[in-house]
């Protein structure tokens, strides 16, 4: 973690200590902030929404969030939405995530910035959008959607798993790590030697975001039969 990000998390620690919200944090930020809070004996609660554990808020009290429906006739992708949102130069801690449910697009955000988002987030790519605040209960039955796959690997090394998903050679996979195409638990990693465990999350640029599932068994040749879940945005 670079110095400016660590300094930012020190500020988030102070906010939590004063009874305010940390904003939405990714997995790496969660790990560091938890260490800081525990080290300084600061009490906190962790709040997640819509089954997403990779974007949570640390706070002493339940924070207020707003759910906005994104109305458009265009077909949008998660990457399009993220790119257009952050083109507004908005702090990532304001946004929980973008979701799809029942053929509709949604986003959930820190309520303090609701009016600003309603006023300024009006376009995704070349497509005009309209935002409307809806009740959180509208998505009470929402759950993250996955495409499940089964792979055979000789070990739980991250590079072995990436090789199976991409069907790339070991040398090509090394290039992916070198070129910063791989993020593990929301941190860029340059080596695939780490051993992953169930529920760990990683992403491969241009391929998608994945979660390590259960071990389904072992083959006679002693390979692991491993479940991998790919996050799906549209259903």
Region spans (language model):
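Ferredoxin-like alpha/beta domains used as RNA- or RNAP-binding modules
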Residues: 1-159, 165, 188, 201, ...
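Basic (Lys/Arg-enriched) interaction patch that binds polyanionic ligands
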Residues: 155-207
